[in-house]
């Protein structure tokens, strides 16, 4: 099992728009079996910059994660939801952990 985190540092005041988009994505991801354990988190305090959003999910294998990611990102509905999201994000990264 693996834990994947997509971490985005949003522009000031734009984290709400990204939360809205991720919530719109969830039903589409669920259609392909991708969001069993997915959750959206935002920063409260600590080492991350303000306006940080984290999308976290577990996957049984990295191959399955990559296949489902390709499948959802080729969906025109997903493309419409994510259109222009770079206007809301300053930077980001992906973290992948093996669950022991």
Residue ranges and their predicted role:
Residues 10-18:
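Short, surface-exposed ligand-recognition loops at beta-strand->loop->(often short) alpha-helix junctions
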Residues 1-2, 100:
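Absolute protein N-terminus
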Residues 21-39, 58-95:
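An amphipathic, aromatic/His-enriched active-site/gating alpha helix that lines ligand/cofactor pockets
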Residues 2-9, 39-72:
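Short, well-ordered beta-strand segments in beta-rich or mixed alpha/beta enzyme
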Residues 44, 97-100:
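Short, solvent-exposed coil/turn elements at secondary-structure transition points
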């Amino acid at each position: 099992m693996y834990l994947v985190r997509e971490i985005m540092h949003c522009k000031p005041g734009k984290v709400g728009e990204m939360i809205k988009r991720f919530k719109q994505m969830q039903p589409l991801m669920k259609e392909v079996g991708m969001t069993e354990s997915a959750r959206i988190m935002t920063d409260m305090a600590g080492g991350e910059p303000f306006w940080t959003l984290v999308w976290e999910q577990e996957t049984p294998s990295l191959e399955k994660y990559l296949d489902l990611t390709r499948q959802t990102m080729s969906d025109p509905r997903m493309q419409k939801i994510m259109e222009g999201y770079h206007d809301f994000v300053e930077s980001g990264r992906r973290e992948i952990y093996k669950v022991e």
